[in-house]
């Protein structure tokens, strides 16, 4: 019998058409009987059923922040699996009425539909009418995952139909109707990358499939046959017409009343609001994606339906992205107006009709948009963006330090403008802006847990996916100095150790001279070790490095987790080695963390599609400094914000009621600027620079360019935090000392600072009139009064 069926199936329609239709009917009946009988008698081992049991549909991997809210996803197909009970009955009825009216009564195939279809096909000479049931569509829809043409031929032949029928009957033997419908409902393609009714309901209507109403269910059912043709977001009129066809079928099948049909047929199409929210944490998410690919593979993360719980704090991440963009733009403007890079007239464009793709985005005050210059006069420039025409005046270009518009722009220039405010007459007040060439990165780590709450690897992920927080290594400048000073504290040198800050030449092991210079060539004479770090003095730092020993400094730096190829250069302590933001921030957490280095991490937990825990972050920590040593260093860095290069952050410390500490860094030729600092709860690092290592601008410093960004980010990280200080070990003594001599403070001293000392190492002498008189001498004369790091009032 099977041979006869196969022969019939392989017969061409041309041969069938040569026969009278009545002669063909016995063959049709024979084919129909063969389909049913063959399915029952000859189907090998229910192979389709075994495959279905092993089948795992492609699911969306969802990325959640620490608050549990989803903020990103990875997918090839947007699908959420739901049970039959979670599908609204009206949705079931709409699909059954449209796709398979006898679904709940047939055995997988509809014999009468088969006969009707074959007769129509013979008359047409090709497959002009289908007879698929919902059950028959399952192997077709799953074929991609069940072996391709091993299961069903791609071509539309009678052989394929017979196989579909056999598989359908096998499926019906082992699954209930409800189970079959659920398989179908979770697998069906619904346009775009949307698969399954649940995802379709959320995508088009912003609701669960359990909550759809009659017109919505009918519209979804109408999408099934040709999804992209009837997508309501792309073809609303066609989608509504198709919806009404489905409603007609539901009425004909008795699923709805005449009144329900009439009301639903005129229901307005109401779709979910388009999600205009900008994505956050692109660099953060990409870093996770790269790591998880090595663990679970591409299929695992794009089809596996994982739930990834991350350490990202949505609020802090958003603040970091905004702060970096704002800070970069401010620093970039300080470098001056570079001029427009594109002129549309030179490209042959019509200025009145040219459209920028971003003009279709929602606009509001504060946005920065592209605008076309239409006309220019010395004190006025007319520009167009979207359907708006506005003017720029001299006060709108104030940051350029120019007043004549015609010397800045010309007709056809494509420029950036900031929407300052919408006036009462409906026109916009604009400010001239420019696309920055500067880049930067931000990293925020929770001290005690190592959780990374925010990471920004560049100004715009769409323009550059290179992560400057993890992948870039740059010279650090003075933010490396705390590791030199830590090496000193480890070896018993106290914050009151004295140096004479003046020009000096040092010689390396090969007798090569090295003459470091202070910032702006300023020298102050006698200074304490703490003050040298607080005010970022280069010469005393090299002196301290020589006293500690280059090898010891390198060993200490490596113990902090810094992996640069350190060489014993005399310039080492001034930050000539290339280090990443990730490593520097990780190292700085040691100071507020009682000497413990905690490995930063981005992922807290990963679960599979069934909720089974695949991995969970474990706190990885090791001791780098003793609690006493860490506290001594932390208090010196706190002084850096109270009165040093980070003093701009002092109001923030007062505002938050938190002890803040940190260090700025600026490299030679001002090509890199840094600020890294901490609170009792978080450590934040900021870097700015160009990818091609060109100078930022001639006045750029870490304190002027990176620190303002750091302040904004730290404020967000600590929002809502209770006032706190760093926990002080029992073996620590606090003393108010003179910043220059390191002696106990008195009225004769110039300035005081509160510093920490390990018990038994605090100064016992008080600064008096003699010490004050020494400080009034020129630096070269002060040298005679410093011996072995201490003040000798007898002059040696």
Annotate each predicted stretch with a short phrase:
Residues 252, 257-363, 379, 517-521, ...:
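Non-catalytic structural connector segments
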Residues 168, 172, 224-242, 303-313, ...:
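Active-site loop and adjoining helix of the penicillin-binding protein/serine DD-peptidase-beta-lactamase fold
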Residues 1-64, 102, 122:
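N-terminal type II signal-anchor transmembrane helix
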């Amino acid at each position: 019998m099977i041979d006869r069926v196969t022969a019939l199936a392989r017969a061409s329609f041309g041969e069938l058409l040569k026969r009278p239709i009545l002669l063909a009917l016995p063959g049709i009946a024979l084919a129909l009987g063969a389909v049913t009988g063959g399915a029952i008698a000859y189907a090998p081992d229910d192979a389709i059923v075994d495959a279905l049991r092993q089948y795992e549909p492609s699911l969306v991997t969802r990325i959640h922040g620490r608050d549990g809210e989803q903020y990103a996803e990875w997918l090839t197909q947007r699908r959420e699996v739901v049970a039959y009970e979670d599908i609204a009955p009206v949705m079931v009825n709409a699909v059954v009425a449209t796709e398979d009216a006898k679904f709940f009564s047939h055995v997988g195939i509809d014999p009468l539909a088969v006969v009707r279809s074959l007769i129509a096909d013979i008359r047409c000479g090709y497959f002009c009418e289908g007879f698929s049931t919902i059950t028959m569509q399952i192997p077709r829809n799953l074929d991609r995952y069940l072996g391709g043409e091993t299961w069903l031929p791609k071509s539309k032949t009678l052989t394929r139909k017979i196989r579909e029928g056999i598989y359908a009957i096998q499926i019906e033997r082992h699954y209930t109707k409800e189970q079959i419908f659920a398989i179908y409902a979770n697998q069906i393609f619904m346009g775009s990358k949307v698969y399954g009714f649940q995802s379709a309901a959320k995508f088009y209507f912003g609701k669960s499939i359990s909550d759809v109403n009659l017109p919505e269910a009918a519209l979804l059912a109408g999408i099934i046959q040709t999804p992209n043709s009837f997508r309501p977001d792309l073809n609303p009129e066609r989608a509504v017409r198709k919806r009404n066809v489905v409603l007609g079928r539901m009425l004909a099948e008795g699923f709805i009343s005449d009144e329900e049909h009439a009301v639903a047929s005129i229901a307005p199409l109401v779709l979910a609001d388009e999600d205009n929210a900008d994505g956050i944490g692109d660099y953060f998410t990409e870093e996770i994606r790269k790591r998880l690919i090595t663990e679970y593979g591409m299929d695992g993360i794009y089809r596996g339906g994982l739930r990834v719980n991350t350490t990202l704090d949505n609020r802090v991440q958003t603040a970091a992205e905004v702060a970096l963009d704002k800070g970069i733009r401010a620093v970039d403007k300080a470098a001056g107006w570079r001029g427009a890079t594109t002129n549309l007239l030179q490209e042959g464009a019509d200025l009145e009709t040219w459209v920028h793709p971003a003009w279709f985005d929602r606009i509001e005050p504060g946005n920065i948009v592209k605008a076309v210059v239409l006309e220019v006069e010395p004190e006025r420039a007319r520009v167009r963006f979207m359907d708006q025409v506005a003017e720029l005046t001299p006060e709108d270009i104030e940051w350029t330090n120019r007043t004549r518009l015609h010397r800045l722009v010309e007709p056809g220039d494509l420029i950036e403008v900031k929407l300052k405010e919408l006036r009462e007459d409906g026109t916009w007040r604009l400010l001239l802006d420019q696309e920055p060439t500067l880049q930067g990165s931000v990293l925020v780590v929770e001290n005690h847990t190592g959780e990374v709450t925010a990471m920004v690897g560049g100004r715009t992920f769409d323009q550059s996916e290179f992560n400057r927080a993890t992948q870039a290594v740059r010279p650090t400048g003075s933010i490396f100095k705390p590791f030199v000073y830590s090496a000193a504290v480890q070896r018993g040198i106290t914050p009151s150790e004295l140096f004479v800050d003046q020009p000096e030449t040092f010689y390396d092991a090969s007798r090569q001279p090295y003459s470091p210079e202070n910032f702006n060539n300023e020298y102050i004479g006698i200074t304490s070790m703490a003050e040298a770090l607080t005010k970022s003095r280069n010469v005393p730092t090299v002196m301290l490095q020589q006293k500690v020993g280059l090898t010891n400094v390198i060993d200490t730096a490596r113990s902090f987790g810094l992996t640069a190829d350190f060489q014993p250069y005399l310039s080492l302590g001034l930050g000539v080695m290339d280090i990443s933001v990730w490593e520097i921030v990780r190292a700085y957490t040691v100071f507020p963390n009682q000497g413990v280095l905690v490995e930063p991490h981005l992922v807290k937990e990963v679960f599979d599609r069934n909720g089974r825990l695949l991995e969970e972050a474990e706190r990885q920590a090791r001791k780098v400094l003793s609690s006493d040593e860490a506290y001594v260093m932390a208090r010196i860095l706190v002084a850096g914000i109270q009165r040093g290069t980070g003093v701009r952050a002092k109001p923030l410390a007062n505002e938050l009621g938190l002890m803040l500490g940190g260090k700025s860094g600026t490299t030679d030729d001002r090509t890199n600027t840094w600020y890294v600092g901490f609170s009792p709860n978080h450590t934040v690092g900021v870097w700015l620079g160009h990818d091609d290592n060109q100078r930022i601008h001639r006045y750029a410093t870490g304190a002027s360019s990176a620190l303002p960004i750091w302040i904004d980010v730290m404020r967000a990280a600590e929002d809502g935090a209770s006032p706190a200080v760093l926990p002080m070990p029992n073996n620590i003594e606090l003393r108010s000392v003179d910043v220059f001599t390191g002696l106990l403070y008195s009225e004769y001293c110039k300035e005081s600072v509160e510093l920490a000392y390990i018990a038994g190492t605090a100064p016992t002498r008080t600064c008096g009139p003699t010490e004050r008189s020494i400080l009034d001498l020129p630096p070269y004369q002060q040298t005679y009064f410093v011996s072995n790091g201490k003040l000798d009032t007898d002059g040696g």
